[in-house]
UniProtKB/Swiss-Prot annotation:
Classification via SUPFAM superfamilies: Cell-division inhibitor MinC, C-terminal domain (SSF63848)
InterPro entries, alphabetized: CAP/MinC_C, MinC, MinC_C_sf, MinC_N, Septum_form_inhib_MinC_C
Gene Ontology biological-process annotations: cell morphogenesis; division septum assembly; regulation of cell division; regulation of cell septum assembly
Gene assigned in the entry: minC
Keyword set includes Cell cycle: yes
Similarity remark: Belongs to the MinC family.
Job description of the protein: Cell division inhibitor that blocks the formation of polar Z ring septums. Rapidly oscillates between the poles of the cell to destabilize FtsZ filaments that have formed before they mature into polar Z rings. Prevents FtsZ polymerization.
Keywords, in A-Z order: Cell cycle, Cell division, Septation
Subunit structure, interactors included: Interacts with MinD and FtsZ.
Official protein name in the record: Probable septum site-determining protein MinC
Amino acid sequence: MADIRITGRMVNFSRITFDTNDHDVIRQQLSNILNEGSYQGTVVIIDSTVEQELIALIQLLVSLGLQPMAVIDGILGDEARAIQFPVLPADQPLQRIKPTAEQVAIVEKPSSAQASVETKKPLNNNAVAHITSYHDEILRTGQSLVQDQGDIILKAAMNSGSEVIASGNIHIYGTVRGRVIAGAGGHAAARIFCQSLEAELVSIAGTYCVADDIPKHVVKKPVHIYLNEKQELEFEALEL
């Protein structure tokens, strides 16, 4: 019997992009963000648009209760390799497209039950906007549809090499062959619904599953995807 076993495991991680190398600023801003949510022990990927003192940055993140796992290849790639820190491939550039239409719902605080469709009135400090993006056309390879304030409803298929990213739920009325990322920003209650699942990757609130690990019984089937109580992805086949 072999003494070594290789198994797949879904990992919940977050990506942090730095546009500054001022570690005092980074500490202050990250501390404010971390105080607003439950991020203790979160595994993070480091991305940066500027040069960094990588070892010092890693130590800073650890001191804030985060677990740096790797860097995105680019500015920090050579420095990471020099200290034998993992390097992940850089993203392929995608074309961010505009949705066919958007609907904005305004929820007044503290009465979260009262919602109305936004016309042209400016938001006040006591209102929260939830935006639903609708897109009628096929999402082609190299295209990205993003909604960071709500849900996405795609009324067509998506090709391999495309992606859909929403802070809320995602509904796709067609075949899914790209990357589908719901709950971006950590919204664990987000869900994914699609008509035919052949995705390269699905993710909810940082917990992801790649194509090879998607349960076979839901491939090419209508599927509902959500996080269970253990924060694991559940794939529920739908009867349509």
